[in-house]
Amino acid sequence: GNMRVVSLNENKEFILNPVGIEKFVTFSSWTLLMCLGYFLIAVINQTMMLLNINAISWLYSWQMVIFVAGISISFLTATVVRYIILPDEVKMGREHGHMFLFHEQIMHNFAAIFFAFEMLIVQPELQPNFAIFGLLFGILYISFAYQLAYFSSGYFVYSFLHPKPKIAPIFAVGLASSIALFYLGLWTITRFNNYNWLSWIIIIGWLSLIVQFRPTKSNHYNN
């Protein structure tokens, strides 16, 4: 669908319909890729185990790496959408019902829910130093966004990534660091797995604060 972007040269906002690889310029699309990638690899590994086929070690390694990055990115995405993007849309009086279409719900809400319950049910052995994977994926996304802007599309999907403002590098570093911080928060919750349902209560409470399934009404719409 259409999305608002910021041109590289003029630093002005305009609307376009991305095609091809440009569809993956949004952070939420990376959330979807992480979710699909993780569960695809998990199904492959589980099927091989059931069929008594020798495990492929690098597949198990990638499953863990993608899980760590995916759950961190999905929680960050849901938080940003609910507390930054949607309030801005309402403040500007924009119609934002498209943010609640099925594919958008998968990227903004259900990815975080799927990853969260996977963590609660499977209880993987997570380590605090795994936060580096989230940081690396953040750097990878930022590199992709700049590569696409300078050598292909000529635009950024997020204004804070535009190099013109002097504080742009701070926002870019902050994005990558936020992924790592979200992972550390989730890892901390896993320390309560042995305390009955405490980890479940905390995660479900956290999810309830970051997911949103219905548009926010504004005076603009009521008028």
Predicted region positions:
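Alpha-helical transmembrane segments in multipass membrane proteins, preferentially the mid-helix core
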Residues: 111-126, 148-151, 181-190
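Membrane-interface transmembrane-helix boundary segments in multi-pass integral membrane proteins
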Residues: 25-26, 152-217
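Non-cytosolic membrane-interface motifs at loop->transmembrane helix junctions
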Residues: 19-26, 58-63, 91-106, 128-133, ...
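Interfacial segments of alpha-helical transmembrane regions
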Residues: 53-73, 124-136
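Membrane-interface loop-to-helix entry segments
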Residues: 100-112, 169-174
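Membrane-embedded alpha-helical transmembrane segments of multi-pass integral membrane proteins
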Residues: 35-41, 45, 70-84, 110-117, ...
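Early transmembrane hairpin module of multi-pass membrane proteins
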Residues: 1-47, 62-68
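Interhelical loop segments of eukaryotic multi-pass membrane proteins
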Residues: 2-16, 50-58, 89-97, 142, ...
